[in-house]
Amino acid sequence: MSEPGMKLEGGCLCGAIRYCINGKVRFVSQCCCRDCQRATGTGHTTIIGVLRSELSVRGVPVTYTSKGESGGDVTRHFCGTCGGRLYTSGTLPGAVVMVQAGSLDDPNRIAPDSVVYYKDALSWDRFDPQLPRFERLPQRSPP
């Protein structure tokens, strides 16, 4: 995870959209849900949970909204020019958004603390055996 009060910056592949996380990172999870697999074309994606109010965005992302496993809306925010994925919002507790860790300028500044939707993990995908694994997104205390 990040240090308290650490500023994290990132953006899309072409640089048209930039963002800054200025607040506490709530979690850093490797998500194995089928939606993330389809959206990324990989076995999982690494997501950083932050409050929406602590994420500032420069540029206007394009969005795509679908229904998540729970039936709530899941909105993916990405660059309309290069297609770079930036963050996901939706019906999450405490106005949390999930930023794509790979879009950080320096992804090595954070580290996963869990694996979520492990029930959907692909047999060939590998995870740190010391990370806790959850069948779904765990209930987290509100910020």
How should these model regions be labeled?
Residues 1-143:
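A short Gly-Trp-Pro
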